[in-house]
């Protein structure tokens, strides 16, 4: 059973009035009601999260800074009630191993006066030293060269700061002496610069300057950059592409159909006789998934707009619609293509390019949603040098090691040389246990996680009969855990998913934490099930009785905003093959698709209560929750 109690959910989009996509409906809403509803939402959000005080991000999101509907941002917390953060004086040399981001050395003892430099080394030392239960982090930014891996040996540890903000970054920081910016094109008001940063051992898949994302060179442009929503804009209309039909089915691995007609498993009370049986198809067009199995490749899928999964295999674009083409070398380009009706967006690499016809044959990709179509919807092309024509864009020439940046400043002003970071790692902290040997009672307190690289081209699977596909990966990854918690943490500018709860997990708690500017989902949870006789696909069957799935997850008193920047089929919280989740007292806004998504009814016992959720489906169609 899914319980949704006292949750204020409003589907809104960017208009002057509290927005609704249908203008005729929006115009019918009285201005007075619209304004009072916004003010009520602001007050409710502050009531849920008094720690946010003025809660300016919520205030701006509700457009309460407008003249037509204005409210002053005031904190509900009186100054006398504001308790400053205090250092935890229970953390001492006796019970902690200390780490320092700039003054540490892994040859040191790990004391407060002789700290280590590596969080991993500190965790390992604490795990093997009697009486050590804290990894104490001095303030600063820790640039990880490798993922922190926590196993059952690290059970019982607490990671927290001791003297200020602790930032854990998956990025590679470019030093000032690596950035000898030289003018590339600064004529006629342009401001494009280039620096030779060398051929990198890590793939350059993103760029952050001053803590904010730059936009990979693309067409159409995004006027205010990737972090500012265009809503339905900044795309080419799908009708401006001549879509190449899907690859013929007979050229793909043969489809194997499986339908479970065990009477004990038959669901015989559904409308229109939909979803009576557990059904899957293996391989065929679903060979793009990992595992290569999906309900939407089964013999007779049912549901709204139901038909077997397929995607176009390429597109031809008239140069008048792609004015900077034909391209000299689009081998590293990517196409971002909405499925018609905007249920999900596919990403494709380029397999072949014919510059005479401007035909792009798609290569790897197209697995970022479970529902297909023969043609593409609205789309854009990214990571092409010829499209470097707008402030805030960049392009990395991997063949020559050259980084080009169109600096958003007056012509002749070079880009900064400080705080220039290449997001690199996909996972910052990996909790790696099993159902029989779990990672237990690890706590993360007050840590900020930033700068992971995108994962939308990583393998995706279809979790269940809903129309989602997911990449089983996140900046924080949990598999095989019990009672792991995150309290007061910040997840910011992560290009993939924020937290991913995979397989066996019990009592994961995320509380008093904030997610912002996330490339995929803020939090995703996806369990495993087993095959049944004749199914022959582990981790994709109907049997969930072995307990290899998340239960009793709690997301409490947290915020999530500006998510799904890259992969549009993303939510503040999504779950599949997960049970008994509690979402309480959260504030979620500004997302491209449904705010909260249960991809199936596995297990039941979920409770969604006392949340504020709005500005969902900002880029897409259908539901808000």
Short names for language-model regions:
Residues 13-14, 125, 608-625:
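Short, intrinsically disordered, charge-balanced linker/junction segments flanking boundaries
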Residues 17-480, 485, 490, 531-547:
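Extracellular polysaccharide-degrading/modifying enzymes targeting complex plant/algal/animal polysaccharides
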Residues 8-9, 143-145, 452, 494-495, ...:
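Flexible loop/turn segments at secondary-structure boundaries
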Residues 146-147, 426, 453-459, 473, ...:
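Short glycine/acidic-rich loop motifs that flank beta-strands on beta-rich extracellular proteins
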Residues 100, 138, 160, 169, ...:
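Residue-level detector of conserved, well-ordered beta-strand and adjacent loop positions
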């Amino acid at each position: 059973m899914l319980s949704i109690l006292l949750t204020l959910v409003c589907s809104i989009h960017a208009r002057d009035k509290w927005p609704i996509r249908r203008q005729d409906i929006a115009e019918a809403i009285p201005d007075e009601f619209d304004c009072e509803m916004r003010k009520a939402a602001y007050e409710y959000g502050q009531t849920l999260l008094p720690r946010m005080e003025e809660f300016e991000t919520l205030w701006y999101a509700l457009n309460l800074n407008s003249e037509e509907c204005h409210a002053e941002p005031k904190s509900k917390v009186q100054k006398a009630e504001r308790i400053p953060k205090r250092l935890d004086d229970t953390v001492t040399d006796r019970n902690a191993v200390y780490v320092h981001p700039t003054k540490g050395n892994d040859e040191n003892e790990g004391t407060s006066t002789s700290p280590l430099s590596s969080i991993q080394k500190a965790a390992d030392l604490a795990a093997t030293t009697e009486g050590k239960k804290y990894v104490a982090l001095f303030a600063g930014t820790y640039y990880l060269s490798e993922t922190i891996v926590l196993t059952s040996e690290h059970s019982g540890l607490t990671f927290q700061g001791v003297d200020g903000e602790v930032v854990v970054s998956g990025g590679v920081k470019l030093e000032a002496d690596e950035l000898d910016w030289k003018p590339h094109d600064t004529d006629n008001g342009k401001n494009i610069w280039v620096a030779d940063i060398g051929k990198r051992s890590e793939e350059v898949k993103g760029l952050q300057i001053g803590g904010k994302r730059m936009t990979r060179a693309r067409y159409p442009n995004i006027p205010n950059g990737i972090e500012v929503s265009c809503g339905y804009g900044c795309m080419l209309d799908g009708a401006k592409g001549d879509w190449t039909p899907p690859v013929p089915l007979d050229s793909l691995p043969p489809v194997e159909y499986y339908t479970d007609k065990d009477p004990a498993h038959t669901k015989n009370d559904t409308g229109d006789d939909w979803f009576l049986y557990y059904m899957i198809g293996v391989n065929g067009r679903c060979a793009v998934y990992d595992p290569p199995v999906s309900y939407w490749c089964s013999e007779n899928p049912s549901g709204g707009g139901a038909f077997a999964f397929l995607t176009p295999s390429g597109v031809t674009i008239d140069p008048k619609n792609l004015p900077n083409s034909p391209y000299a070398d689009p081998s590293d380009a990517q196409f971002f293509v909405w499925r018609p009706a905007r249920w999900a967006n596919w990403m494709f690499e380029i397999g072949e390019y014919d510059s005479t016809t401007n035909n792009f044959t798609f290569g790897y990709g197209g697995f970022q949603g479970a529902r297909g179509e023969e043609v593409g919807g609205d789309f854009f092309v990214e990571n092409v040098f010829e499209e470097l024509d707008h402030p805030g864009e960049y392009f990395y020439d991997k063949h020559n090691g050259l980084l080009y940046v169109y600096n958003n400043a007056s012509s002749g002003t070079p880009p900064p040389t400080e705080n220039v970071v290449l997001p690199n790692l996909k996972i910052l902290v990996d909790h790696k246990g099993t159902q029989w040997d779990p990672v237990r009672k690890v706590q993360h307190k007050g840590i900020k996680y930033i700068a992971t690289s995108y994962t939308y081209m990583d393998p995706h699977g279809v979790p269940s009969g809903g129309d989602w596909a997911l990449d089983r990966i996140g900046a924080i990854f949990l598999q095989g855990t019990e009672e792991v918690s995150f309290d007061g943490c910040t997840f910011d500018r992560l290009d993939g998913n924020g937290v991913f709860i995979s397989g066996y997990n019990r009592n994961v708690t995320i509380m008093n934490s904030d997610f912002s500017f996330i490339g995929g989902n803020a939090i995703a949870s996806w369990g495993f099930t087993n095959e049944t006789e004749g199914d022959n696909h582990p981790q994709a069957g109907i049997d969930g009785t072995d307990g290899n799935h998340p239960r009793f997850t709690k997301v409490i008193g947290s915020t999530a905003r500006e998510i799904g920047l890259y992969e549009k089929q993303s939510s503040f919280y999504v779950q599949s093959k997960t049970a008994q989740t509690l979402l309480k007292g959260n504030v979620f806004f500004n997302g491209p698709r449904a705010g909260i998504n249960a991809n199936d009814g596995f297990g039941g016992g979920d409770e969604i209560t006392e949340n504020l959720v709005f500005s969902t489906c900002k880029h897409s169609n259908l539901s808000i929750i």
